[in-house]
Amino acid sequence: MGRFIFVSFGLLVVFLSLSGTGADCPSDWSSYEGHCYRVFQQQMNWADAEKFCTQQRKESHLVSFESSEEVDFVVSKTFPILKENFVWIGLSNVWNGCRLQWSDGTELKYNAWSAESECIASKTTDNQWWSMDCSKTYPFVCKLIV
């Protein structure tokens, strides 16, 4: 009986130490502030990248940003591995006429505009957002709510 309690306590300690460390994210995804992020190096147009993100996991879309700290985290993941200067982010007016919104439906609270257009790419070297032709192909970042 004592051994069972010891093993059970050990498993509880391991479980508690893993909670909040990214253990809730799928493998190959990075955790930040209750969300998971993954950089995909393959190049797609905006619509295909958004579709690809939604097919990865339920509640996954092209990345949306709520703060400059979140942008800095994503840049820290994208800049070291990408050779491209731009990545698609989830901001566009594809789904909602002229009103820009994130592909996951959230409203635009934080922005870092360089220009305005249908589909927005983030420049990996200076964190600015650029309007791009939606048919151009770039790597992209998916964001998953956990």
Swiss-Prot record:
Keyword Signal: yes or no?
Answer: yes
Q: Which N-terminal stretch is annotated as signal sequence?
A: 1-23
GO cellular component terms, alphabetically, are:
extracellular region; other organism cell membrane
Q: Which InterPro entries match?
A: C-type_lectin-like (IPR001304), C-type_lectin-like/link_sf (IPR016186), C-type_lectin/snaclec_domain (IPR050111), C-type_lectin_CS (IPR018378), CTDL_fold (IPR016187)
Q: Which GO terms describe its biological process?
A: venom-mediated suppression of platelet aggregation
The record's section on Gene3D superfamilies has:
Mannose-Binding Protein A, subunit A
Q: In which tissues is it expressed?
A: Expressed by the venom gland.
Q: What is its main location?
A: secreted
Kindly list the cysteine pairs connected by disulfide bridges.
25-36, 53-142, 119-134
SMART domains for the chain? CLECT
Q: Which residues form a coiled coil?
A: none
* Domain C-type lectin residues, every copy: 32-143
UniProt-annotated location(s): Secreted
Kindly list the GO molecular function terms attached to this UniProt entry.
Answer: toxin activity
Metal-binding found in the keyword field: no
- Could you tell me the keywords of this UniProt record? Disulfide bond, Hemostasis impairing toxin, Platelet aggregation inhibiting toxin, Secreted, Signal, Toxin
Entry function: Snaclec that dose-dependently inhibits platelet aggregation induced by ristocetin or low-dose thrombin, but not by high-dose thrombin. Binds to GPIbalpha (GP1BA). In vivo, also dose-dependently induces thrombocytopenia of mice and platelet counts remains at very low level even after 18 hours intravenous injection.
Record's family? Answer: Belongs to the snaclec family.
Q: Describe the subunit structure.
A: Heterodimer of subunits alpha and beta; disulfide-linked.
* PANTHER family from the UniProt entry: MANNOSE, PHOSPHOLIPASE, LECTIN RECEPTOR RELATED
Q: What else is known?
A: Negative results: does not induce platelet aggregation in either platelet rich plasma or washed platelets under high-dose conditions. Does not inhibit platelet aggregation induced by high-dose thrombin. Does not react with polyclonal anti-GPVI and anti-GPIIb antibodies.
According to UniProt, the name of this protein is Snaclec jerdonibitin subunit beta
